[in-house]
From Swiss-Prot:
The keyword tRNA processing applies. Its EC number is 2.1.1.-. It is an enzyme of class 2 (transferase). This is tRNA N(3)-cytidine methyltransferase METTL6. GO terms for biological process: tRNA methylation; tRNA modification. It comes from Rattus norvegicus (Rat).
Length: 287
């Protein structure tokens, strides 16, 4: 089994059969059930981690390869990096980073109290290098746990897709408060026309590009335009915003699974430098 990866500005083009499937599956889940799913979102994720423990997701050792910002503490000896992993799950991204770089200090939070407990039980967990807490990013103020404008990078990796589209902007506004000016949110999540989107059965659709799994957890599939507008409207500047295509090929079984992700960086604008004494006096003379 092999995996091939490439990047591009446009999402995957569907086959005729795939297009027909999406056209057939237009019926939406009832408003009553959608309200119930929103109300029980935390419970459903907690049950997910109860069923799967720490075994569902693989450790993500690719993040430093894809995001050079996570390597920025390697430029000189003693350099530190303060990270927020927003939506840390059970630590599949967090612990590879802490293990790889001793100069990283991480804040990490998750919607699920059970996931937070698993992080604290991990053999690599060290309270001196990591502060972990439960948080609903759409409602709970990160400033209760993190000083304002103190974080060098924020990771949002397969997190925002689990949030209702009408509440996604609240997550971005929340992390904006703790991110240093001139620093970036590092994003990767499901892209439009991903194989997982096409596997949903009829009766799973909640809205445009938004679906519910059998266990009650939800997933949104992003376009680059939707994501860019979401970030820019929250005050960020676009740095990179592109699709990542991965094909997992099993030649023995004749299978090819086309995955589509969106990988992006959005920067909090740097603060304008304070005017010097000379420039300030010139301004006074002008006016």
């Amino acid at each position: 089994m092999t995996s091939l990866q490439r990047k591009g500005p446009q999402t995957r083009i569907l086959s005729t059969g795939e297009e027909e499937k999406l056209k057939r599956d237009q019926a939406l889940v009832s408003a009553f059930k959608q309200q119930k799913l929103e109300k029980e979102a935390q419970k459903n994720w907690d049950l997910f981690y109860k069923r799967n423990s720490t075994n569902f997701f693989k450790d993500r050792h690719w993040t430093t390869r894809e995001f050079e910002e996570l390597r920025s503490c390697r430029e000189y000896e003693g350099q530190k990096l303060t990270l927020l992993e927003a939506g840390c799950g059970v630590g599949n991204c967090l612990f590879p980073l802490l293990e790889e770089d001793s100069n990283i200090f991480a804040y990490a939070c998750d919607f699920s109290p059970r996931a937070v407990d698993y992080v604290k039980q991990h053999p690599l967990y060290n309270a001196e290098r990591c502060k972990v807490f439960q948080c609903d990013l759409t409602r709970d103020d990160l400033l209760d746990h993190i000083p304002p404008e103190s974080v060098d990078a924020v990771t949002l990796i397969f997190v925002l897709s689990a949030v209702h589209p009408e509440k996604m902007h609240l997550v971005l506004l929340n992390v904006y408060k703790v991110l240093k000016p001139g620093r970036s949110v590092l994003f990767r999540d499901y892209g439009l026309n991903d194989h997982a989107m096409l596997r949903f059965k009829a009766g799973s659709k909640l809205g445009e590009n938004f679906y519910v799994r059998q266990d009650g957890t939800r997933s949104y599939f992003f376009t680059d335009e939707f994501l860019a507008k979401l970030f820019v409207d929250a005050g960020y500047e676009e740095v990179v915003n592109e699709y990542v295509f991965r094909e997992t090929v099993n030649k023995k079984e004749g299978l090819c699974v086309p995955r589509v992700f969106l990988q992006s960086k959005f920067r909090k604008p740097p603060k304008d430098p304070a005017p010097t004494t000379d420039s300030a006096s010139l301004l006074r003379k002008e006016f």
